[in-house]
């Protein structure tokens, strides 16, 4: 049987039903305990073994990537969260969204060491069934929570710049906290099936941790892609296009603030394009492929490798978000430089959000 990668990107056809847990399994075949035959797809174990193996070089590269990602993301998001909490008195919507974004990143960063061990061990999962489920749950929780928090930041910027006066009552810290709480609940409930479905299989002395959607090869998977990614992505792009159009139409905003607005747009969209778009495009192709069947071994190998690479890019989000904080949140940048350099930067007192008024169009906010 293939020792294929466990994380969400390197999924096989719906074989998450396969499970080896001692006496819990109902059958045994060639040393592999499996679930009842009705739960297994027509993709044979032999085909998976031939087409989906990872090489030692791939394991080393993936492990090295996750090690670097873990260090950068842990340091960056821990520092960011500390600064945001310390500055909680600012009470701005953007501060609230950024703080929750840092929490989402940390929820995934803390389980990255399990991936390191998995790859350094040659695709062997030594942590057990529960840890396997929890790792996949936190992976998806971080990814989709991050996507929606970035969308909230985009919508908040749109209201602050394009409708500064009309949005005063709507853009309140309390509403931002409620929106974040709602998103946490929705994403956690959506990912909850990963906590209750079997996720490990064993062949000989090697345990593989699989993280799959049960509906991976069904219409439900495509609906999930549309709701969980396409909608927030289109919303984010639309908000920023409207912001750019308003700035180009001559709104009374200082040149410096216009530059900051454009910079934030570029960084957020870059995070989407680098971290999330490749993964979801590849996953769409993967879902459609396993609905059609009949692909060659070479095609299956390419799809599996693409899944692993795009999953790495998704995890990179945790390391890129602190860079976004540094370039788009002036107060974060000043606080970080003061902390690291031991001296204050020159310039006006920084703030995540200034006062909103009709002449400035609230452009002095979190940009």
Curated annotation (Swiss-Prot):
Which sequence ranges are marked TM in the entry? 65-85, 93-113, 134-154, 176-196, 224-244, 261-281, 309-329
Q: In which tissues is it expressed?
A: Expressed in brain, kidney, heart and umbilical vein endothelial cells. Highest level in brain.
Per the UniProt entry, what is one GO biological process? oligodendrocyte differentiation
Sorted keywords for this record are: Cell membrane, Disulfide bond, G-protein coupled receptor, Glycoprotein, Membrane, Receptor, Transducer, Transmembrane, Transmembrane helix
Q: Which family does it belong to?
A: Belongs to the G-protein coupled receptor 1 family.
Question: What Gene Ontology cellular component terms go with this record?
Answer: plasma membrane
The chain's Extracellular topological domains, given as residue ranges, are: 1-64, 114-133, 197-223, 282-308
Disulfide bond in keyword set: yes
Name the chain's protein. Uracil nucleotide/cysteinyl leukotriene receptor
Gene expressing this chain: GPR17
Task: Enumerate the PANTHER family for this protein.
Answer: G-PROTEIN COUPLED RECEPTOR (PTHR24232), URACIL NUCLEOTIDE_CYSTEINYL LEUKOTRIENE RECEPTOR (PTHR24232:SF44)
Q: What is its main location?
A: membrane
Check the record and name the SUPFAM superfamilies matching this protein. Family A G protein-coupled receptor-like
Q: Where is this region: Disordered?
A: 1-28
Q: Please report any disulfide bonds recorded for this protein chain, giving both cysteine positions.
A: 132-209
Tell whether Nucleotidyltransferase is among the UniProt keywords.
no
What PROSITE patterns does the record tag this protein with? G_PROTEIN_RECEP_F1_1 (PS00237), G_PROTEIN_RECEP_F1_2 (PS50262)
Outline what the protein does.
Answer: Dual specificity receptor for uracil nucleotides and cysteinyl leukotrienes (CysLTs). Signals through G(i) and inhibition of adenylyl cyclase. May mediate brain damage by nucleotides and CysLTs following ischemia.
Cite the ranges annotated as topological domain Cytoplasmic.
86-92, 155-175, 245-260, 330-367
Which organism was this protein described from? Homo sapiens (Human)
What GO molecular function annotation could you give as one example from this UniProt entry? Answer: receptor serine/threonine kinase binding
Provide the residues annotated with a glycan attachment (glycosylation). 42, 204, 282
Annotated membrane topology is: Multi-pass membrane protein
Q: Please give the InterPro entries that the UniProt record associates with this protein.
A: GPCR_Rhodpsn, GPCR_Rhodpsn_7TM
The subcellular localization recorded is: Cell membrane
């Amino acid at each position: 049987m293939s020792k294929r990668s466990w994380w969400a990107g390197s999924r096989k056809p719906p074989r998450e039903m396969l499970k080896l847990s001692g006496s819990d399994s109902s059958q045994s075949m060639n040393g592999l305990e499996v679930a009842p035959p009705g739960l297994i797809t027509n993709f044979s174990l032999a085909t998976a073994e031939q087409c989906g193996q990872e090489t030692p070089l791939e394991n080393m590269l993936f492990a090295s990537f996750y090690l670097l990602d873990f260090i950068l993301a842990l340091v960056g998001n821990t520092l960011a969260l500390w600064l945001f909490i310390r500055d909680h008195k600012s009470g701005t919507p953007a501060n609230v969204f950024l703080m929750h974004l840092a929490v989402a990143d940390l929820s995934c960063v803390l389980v990255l060491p399990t991936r390191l061990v998995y790859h350094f061990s040659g695709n062997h999962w030594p942590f057990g069934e529960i840890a396997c489920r929890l790792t996949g749950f936190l992976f998806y929780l971080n990814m989709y929570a991050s996507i929606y928090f970035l969308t909230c930041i985009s919508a908040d910027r749109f209201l602050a710049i394009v409708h500064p006066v009309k949005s005063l009552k709507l853009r309140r810290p309390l509403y931002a906290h409620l929106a974040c709480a709602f998103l946490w609940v929705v994403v956690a409930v959506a990912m909850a099936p990963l906590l209750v479905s079997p996720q490990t299989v064993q062949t000989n002395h090697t345990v593989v941790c699989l993280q799959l959607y049960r509906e991976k090869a069904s219409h439900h998977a495509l609906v999930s892609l549309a709701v969980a990614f396409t909608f927030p992505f289109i919303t984010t792009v639309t908000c920023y296009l409207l912001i750019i159009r308003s700035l180009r139409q001559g709104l009374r905003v200082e040149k410096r603030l216009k530059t900051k607005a454009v910079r934030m747009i570029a960084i957020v969209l870059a995070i989407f394009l680098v971290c999330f778009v490749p993964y979801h495009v590849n996953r769409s192709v993967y879902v459609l492929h396993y609905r059609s069947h009949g692909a060659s071994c070479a095609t299956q190998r390419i799809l599996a490798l693409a899944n692993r690479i795009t999953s790495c890019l998704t995890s990179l989000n945790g390391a890129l978000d602190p860079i976004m904080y540094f370039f788009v949140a002036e107060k974060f940048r000043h606080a970080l430089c003061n902390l690291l350099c031991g001296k204050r930067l020159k310039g006006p007192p920084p703030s995540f959000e200034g006062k909103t008024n009709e002449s400035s169009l609230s452009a002095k906010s979190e940009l």
